[in-house]
Amino acid sequence: AWVFSASPDFSKKIGTMGWLGMSFPKKYGGHERTALERYIVTEELLASGAPVAAHWIADRQSGSQILRFGTEEQKNLIIPKITSGECFFAIGMSEPNSGSDLASVKTKATKTNDGWKLEGRKIWSTGAHIAHYMIVLARTSPASKENRHEGLSQFLVDLSLPNIKIKGIEDMTGQRHFNETLFDNVILSKESLLGEEGKGWSQVVGELALERSGPERFLSHFTLLEKFIGEFRISLLKSGSSLVGKLIAELQTLRRM
C-alpha cells in the first residue's frame, strides 16, 4: 500500500514532471489538468509500487482543503511547494480517545494577543515524521449541549515550531509510518487559522470526504494483491485460484465504475 513507502526525492522528481497538484489552479503552481488525467498518473504510480507516501496527503487532500478555505497568503505560501514536491502534510484529526467520535477532540487552541496557543495531541498521524505541516482540528470554544460540533476550528501548523514532539508508532511489520504528535503550548500566529473560526466541523467533514473516497482507495490494493499471490503462490495453485479470481474481478469492476 502507498503508506509503506516514502521518498522525498522521488516526490520532488515527479513534482518537476508536473505530476503533483495536477488539478490545482495554475496561478498557484498547479497544472489545471482533468480528473481523468490525474487518475491515469495515480493508477500508474500505485500499480508500479512507487514511493508516493511523502507527498500523498498534501497532494490528495491538504492542498484541496487550503484551496477551498485558505487565504490568498496561505495559498501562495504553500500550494506551489506542494506542486513542486517540497511540502508534505500530515493529518491532525484523531486523538487517543477521539477516533470515530471526532467531535470529542480535546486538543485546544486558545486565543492570545498575537495569535493562538495550541495544546493537545494527535495520533495515527501518517508521515508526520517527514511532514512540514499538519492541518490540526482543535477546539477553540466550548461545545453547547445542543450541538457538540460547535466551537471547532482548523489550523495550519508548521511542524518545525518549538514544543512539538513527534513519536513513531511501530506497527506489526516493524515499520513506523504512524505517529503520535504532541503539542505543548505551541505558539501559532493568527495567520495559522484555516478557514473560519468555529466552522472546523463543516470543514473537516469536507476533508474527510477527500480522505475516505476516491479511486486511490482501491488502486492501492494492486501491489498488495500481487505480493499476496507471490507469497502464497503454491497454496493458491492448489486451492485458492477462485479466491484470486474473485479479488481480481472485484478490482476490475471497481476500476470500470
Map each language-model feature to its residues:
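A short core secondary-structure module
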Residues: 119-165
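Glycine-rich beta->alpha junctions and the first turn(s) of the following alpha-helix
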Residues: 164-255
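A structural signal for short hydrophobic beta-strand segments in well-ordered beta-sheet cores
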Residues: 107-110
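Internal helix-loop-helix
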Residues: 15-86, 126-133
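Short Ser/Thr-interspersed hydrophobic loop/turn segments at strand-loop and sheet-helix junctions
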Residues: 18, 41-46, 137-138, 156-161, ...
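A short, Trp-centered hydrophobic/proline-enriched beta-strand micro-motif
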Residues: 85-93, 137
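Short Gly/Pro-enriched turn/cap motifs at secondary-structure boundaries
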Residues: 55, 97-100, 124-127, 145-146, ...
